[in-house]
From Swiss-Prot:
GO biological process: isopentenyl diphosphate biosynthetic process, methylerythritol 4-phosphate pathway; terpenoid biosynthetic process
Main function: Bifunctional enzyme that catalyzes the formation of 4-diphosphocytidyl-2-C-methyl-D-erythritol from CTP and 2-C-methyl-D-erythritol 4-phosphate (MEP) (IspD), and catalyzes the conversion of 4-diphosphocytidyl-2-C-methyl-D-erythritol 2-phosphate (CDP-ME2P) to 2-C-methyl-D-erythritol 2,4-cyclodiphosphate (ME-CPP) with a corresponding release of cytidine 5-monophosphate (CMP) (IspF).
Domain of life: Bacteria
Family matches, as CDD domains: CDP-ME_synthetase, MECDP_synthase
Positions of the UniProt region annotated as 2-C-methyl-D-erythritol 2,4-cyclodiphosphate synthase: 214-379
Protein name: Bifunctional enzyme IspD/IspF
GO MF, any single term: 2-C-methyl-D-erythritol 4-phosphate cytidylyltransferase activity
Family label: In the N-terminal section; belongs to the IspD/TarI cytidylyltransferase family. IspD subfamily.
UniProt site positions, description: Positions MEP for the nucleophilic attack: 142, 193
Cofactors, names only: a divalent metal cation
Chain residue ranges for the region called 2-C-methyl-D-erythritol 4-phosphate cytidylyltransferase: 1-213
Organism: Wolinella succinogenes (strain ATCC 29543 / DSM 1740 / CCUG 13145 / JCM 31913 / LMG 7466 / NCTC 11488 / FDC 602W)
Annotated positions binding 4-CDP-2-C-methyl-D-erythritol 2-phosphate: 220-222, 246-247, 268-270, 273-277, 344-347, 351, 354
Amino acid sequence: MSQVSLVVMGAGESSRFRQGLSIKKQWLRLGETPLWKHVALHLSKQACFDQVIITASPKEVKYMQKQVDFEVIEGGGTRQESLQNALASVKTPWVLVSDVARFDVPSEVISRVIGRLGEAECVAPAIGVSDTVSYQGEYLSRSEVKLIQTPQLSHVESLLLAFRQGDFTDESSAIAKSGGRVLLVEGSERLKKLTHPHELTLLQGFEPPFGGCYGGSGFDVHAFMEGEGLRLAGVNIPAPVTFKAHSDGDVAIHALIDALLGAAGAGDIGEWFPDSDLAYKGVDSTLLLQEVIKFIRGIGFELINADLTIMAQAPKLSPYKEAMERRLGEVMEVSRQRISVKATTTESLGFVGRKEGVAVSAQVVLKLLDWTKHACFNR
């Protein structure tokens, strides 16, 4: 059995990166492969690891697990909390920790780091600086200044003890603070960290995102009961009935959510918002749609088109179609031109024809965000 496990940090919210883009950096695609998966697969082949663990944000755990055979662990609010969650599952005495942001890890760096196993509580790659360095008015010797990189190899027990001392940005600083020995080995200029949108140029030479489209469909029905009106596509419709439902019963948005999740391969509305959860009792479905579209964008998709067909014998919906398109555009933050809402009857056939309820069919088309088209990449 190997003495080392691998942990890939992929749970971050990419707050600095997303100041210019909607996507989280770990979901940038190389072809159809997200960056976190590219990093995990590459690193996993560089040594004989006993375990490979990937940290993920809570809403992405199941989605990431679907794409790999490695163990995916829910991360925390900070990098350190995420790593501590992962360490709880590590069974080996040593762990190699790497960040998705450093996506181009040379094999020789991994060999240098792991090759010094046992010589210190932490082994980390580092590079020197070529610029003159000043700190609080004092000029420092460049030979004494090092930029610490990842991946870093740490003794698990020592690292867990070190984390009790406070919050740290990496393993080496935690172990050094606790009095442990940190050994620095030669790093690489290729280990530059992707943090801001202007650093997309670091991806030059890598495969651009897959340019095809992803289609999804959704279908939902709700029965009527006595009430004071319906809500469809976020628009209030006067009627002597309302929907029997756990939420507000917006059958149009529910079908649309299923279509979005289907196109992304991310489950269905029942998995995301179960009707057994009291938190969704009477909830405004536009809030659910906002959550889903934020997720869809965060994992790297853009909405190209959404097409809804509402089947209702009554009430008459044609006067409200434009308002529905506008409202869906507002909620999803897209142009109304990308949304089509159609209304039809069933010629008095079936439960819809008997005016017992409404059915909605929705289709969407998504595509991957193309980072090669971003202004920051083409500077």
